[in-house]
Amino acid sequence: MPQLIGQKVTDVLAFEGNIYKLKVVSNILKTKKNRSGETVRSIRVDAQNQDLIVWGRENFHNMETGISPVEAKQNDFAFLKAKIWGWSKYLPLDFTNGQRAKFSFNVSNSLREKGSLLFQQGGRKDIYSNEEEALLKNISDKVGQIIVNTQIL
């Protein structure tokens, strides 16, 4: 009987985790934070053995927090510049004669000195944080119903 309860709980976690994922994706699209689409494609839901993990690509948390100077300095400058170079391809800007390289250099320098503008403004709470309370409540309610409705004896 406990295995049956455990499987029902895992099913609830998978269901609610996927709803959470859809809400996060919707928030990313609504806030226009989807330049390359890599972050949206990276979000995964893993529910097994009564555990739920929702995860995404490295630095997913930066969508709400921005990048601090400390975090930017943890990366090699050339690595950071290369990441900015790749990201800049999705910006609606035309670069000619090495301007993309200068842009990448300047943005990388700025990140290491001041952090991103989002970080400087204190971050935001409308990508994933605002959906967490509903996720926890829905899981709690549904798991509670499973326990109440299961006759163990």
Locate the predicted segments by residue.
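Charge-rich, low-complexity N-terminal segments
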Residues: 1-46
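Charged, low-complexity interaction tracts
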Residues: 38-153
